[in-house]
Amino acid sequence: MNCCICQFSVRVPKDIHTDTVGHPPVLISELVLQCTRGTNYVLTEESSTICKKCCEKLARYHKSIQIARKLRGEILELIHSPYMSKDHKQTSYKEDDLDRETTISKFDGNIEEAQQQDEEEQELESVGTTVTLVGPAGIVEEVAEEEHTFIIKQSEEEDEFHSVDLELDIDNEIIINEEEAHEVEEVAHEIEEVAHEIEEEDLLPHDKQEAQEEDFFKEDTMSDFDEHLDGAIEYIISDGEDQEQDNESSGEYTVNIQCPSCPEKFSSRRAYNVHTKREHFPGYVCDQCGKTLQSYSGFIGHLQNHEPVKQFACPVCPERFSRKFRLKHHMAWHSGETPYQCDVCSKRFVHKVALYKHKMIHDSETKRLECQVCGFKTRTKAHLERHMRSHTGDKPFACPVCNKRFSQMYNMKAHLREHESPGTNRHRRFHCSKCTHTFINEQNYDAHVQRDDCTPV
């Protein structure tokens, strides 16, 4: 069974339609559909298994969504909460409109007195300075004042006042002619007294209490925000503070990590992680061939060798490859070029990697492993194991077609290619000048020439 996401074989599968992850629990299939929304991915009924790695990624994805939703709610609460008391205050103003009508009615008598000043206001109209008063009866009066203007507007749809402007700065108004301003000074003074009276009555005790409650609410909200912020900062630097307290006398920051599996101690977490992975980590074991790999990327690449999708085809022969660099290396065999030469023994190679590995043969310092039979030295344990098969005669690799056995894997693969496409195993670069024999490697060609047993053409 293969994972429905990474398409690799699953050793301990989970059913995405029945198993859940996260808290609160959610079906794995729902998370898969949520992650792949907007893509061409189709979740079929057959693809019902998922591997452990992909399941852990979906669990982290689900957890991040829950954290994001929680943080969004807290942010929106901080944004909207300070205005809730203000909206409540505006609502209370509307409830007190009837009480204000009684207060504003006191101003109506002054409106009638202002009507008698019609001639004086017409003179003010000529100099272009006006103040508009709209009364309940719809009478429009124009009065000039130097410091305060009281404006009352009556709605055409409702029979109540929406707002009363108590103070209006008129510094930007047109300056009234001093000779004509004194004519309306008395009327403006009366309007100012009424406005001041309304202002005092407007500020009721419960309004003062609401204002105090609003200030208290803002302070309480900010205190909650400060607590969250302090908690986050404390969570981040808690470890550092503990270490600083422990080393306060010395003034230095040190870490002492004890490995639970061995007596080793480390001064940094990075060094501890490297030690654990190199010495105590069992590695990633392939469930098909049993091979152990230390890195996860190497393990994924190894799994692709078992079930490869060979999408890169050779234009010369029927060979296909799962990776592009392997096709590039294969094409070098068709060209017959050997651009890389060893500067010690002058041996030439098709690939640079082959030359690099060959140079290690000449480097005696890297040969730390020695064969106990013939004294052959090598730098890797795998190479020593392959060499030991030449002494033991062990041939663990069998051809699946003819059951012929080989001591090395690459020999078996080369033999198997002959079954699949005879004559196209590899490009035979070495041709005998005396006969029709061709050879893949130079060693076989040299042995053929030295024997001199070929038939002339």
Swiss-Prot record:
It comes from Drosophila melanogaster (Fruit fly). Its main location: nucleus. A zinc finger (C2H2-type) spans 257-280, 284-306, 312-334, 340-362, 369-391, 397-419, 430-448. SUPFAM superfamilies: beta-beta-alpha zinc fingers. Keywords: Chromatin regulator, Chromosome, DNA-binding, Metal-binding, Nucleus, Repeat, Transcription, Transcription regulation, Zinc, Zinc-finger. It is found in: Nucleus; Chromosome. This is Zinc finger protein ZIPIC. The gene is ZIPIC. GO terms for biological process: chromatin organization; regulation of DNA-templated transcription; regulation of transcription by RNA polymerase II. Interacts (via region between the ZAD domain and the first zinc finger domain) with Cp190 (via centrosomal targeting M domain); the interaction is direct. Interacts with pita. The keyword Metal-binding applies. InterPro entries: Znf_C2H2_sf (IPR036236), Znf_C2H2_type (IPR013087). GO terms for cellular component: chromosome; nucleus; polytene chromosome. One of its GO terms (molecular function) is chromatin insulator sequence binding. Pfam families: zf-C2H2 (PF00096), zf-C2H2_4 (PF13894), zf-C2H2_6 (PF13912). Residues 3-84 form the ZAD domain. Gene3D superfamilies: Classic Zinc Finger (3.30.160.60). PANTHER family: C2H2-TYPE DOMAIN-CONTAINING PROTEIN (PTHR24379:SF121), KRAB AND ZINC FINGER DOMAIN-CONTAINING (PTHR24379). Insulator DNA-binding protein. Recruits Cp190 and cooperatively binds to chromatin promoter regions to exert transcriptional regulator and chromatin insulator functions. Chromatin insulators are regulatory elements that establish independent domains of transcriptional activity within eukaryotic genomes. Insulators are proposed to structure the chromatin fiber into independent domains of differing transcriptional potential by promoting the formation of distinct chromatin loops to form topologically associating domains (TADs). Coiled coil: none annotated.
